[in-house]
Design a protein with these regions (language model features):
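Basic/polar phosphate-binding segments, predominantly the helix-turn-helix DNA-binding elements
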Residues: 152-183, 205-227
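Single conserved hydrophobic/aromatic residue that forms the stacking wall/gate
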Residues: 2-13
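Glycine- and acidic-residue-biased ligand/ion/polar-headgroup-sensing regions
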Residues: 17-31, 69
């Protein structure tokens, strides 16, 4: 859930790191990426470590599939790290079936029918997951459950050397384990602020595994563009990663894993 404001030039939507990758089909007008031009009409959004603004000047009508942290890799034949901080036009992937799906959705106005197209596409590509997938899934579960954990600990738990673990994790998730841990920690901050906007900064720091309040503010500003106090004064915090009312609900999914 991205926050939005109106500046007279269109609605402005704040984009921030979510910890997940998206497959998006615009059926209305494309959003404008601030200072970078229009989003592709149909695209994959990789893992993002940077914030930004998306500007709408027309009719928003899109279908977006938000994947769990490891969810996209079985369906797209490229290293997830190639998608890092990028919007990849579906046409550039040279994926015949995915482009056929794009064309089917663009010509079909019934949303439920489009959802059926997407489900059929995904079902056809389901494959047995490999052992590295299970290793990375376990690492993500540890990151979710433990506010403070070292990458070396994750590598040891996966029975891999540090460099090999980093390479496998990055290829599956789309960013390095250290950076992904920081994004999840940012989402944890949002979730605690969402549930208790008046939480003391010391409690927030401790609960999210930061060394001190200045460390928290530095990371929060890097991922959102402002301090927690400034954030609360301009919008309502919401974590798509941890929120119980979110259908994505990553934390419950990994609790069952």
């Amino acid at each position: 859930r991205d926050s939005s404001t109106s500046r007279g030039l269109g609605d402005v939507y704040k984009r921030q790191p979510s910890g997940c990758m998206h497959l998006v089909f615009h059926r209305g007008d494309s959003l404008n990426i601030h200072a970078k031009g229009l989003q592709p009409k149909n695209f994959i959004r990789g893992q993002f470590s940077i914030y930004g603004n998306l500007i709408s000047k027309g009719n928003i009508d899109m279908i977006a599939i938000i994947f769990h942290p490891l969810g996209l890799k079985p369906f797209i034949q490229c290293p997830m790290s190639d998608l890092y901080n990028r919007y990849i036009d579906i046409e550039d992937l040279e994926d015949i079936e995915l482009n056929h799906l794009k064309n089917s959705i663009s010509s079909e106005r019934n949303v439920q029918t489009c959802i059926q197209f997407i489900e059929l596409f995904l079902m056809k590509r389901l494959v047995d997951i490999d052992y590295n997938h299970k290793r990375v899934q376990n690492s993500i579960s540890q990151i979710i459950k433990q506010p403070q954990i070292e990458v070396n600990t994750l590598a040891e738990s996966a029975c891999l050397g540090y460099r090999q673990f980093k390479r496998i994790f990055t290829n599956h998730v789309g960013m390095s384990p250290k950076e992904y841990y920081r994004v999840v920690r940012f989402q944890r901050v949002l979730y605690l602020l969402q549930n208790n906007p008046k939480i003391e900064i010391a409690d927030l720091t401790y609960s999210c595994g930061f060394y001190d309040p200045s460390h928290l503010v530095k990371d929060f500003r890097e991922f959102s563009g402002c301090s927690p106090t400034q954030y609360l004064s301009s919008r309502s915090p919401y974590s798509t990663f941890f929120s119980e009312d979110c259908r994505l609900n990553v934390i419950k999914s990994h609790s069952r894993a």
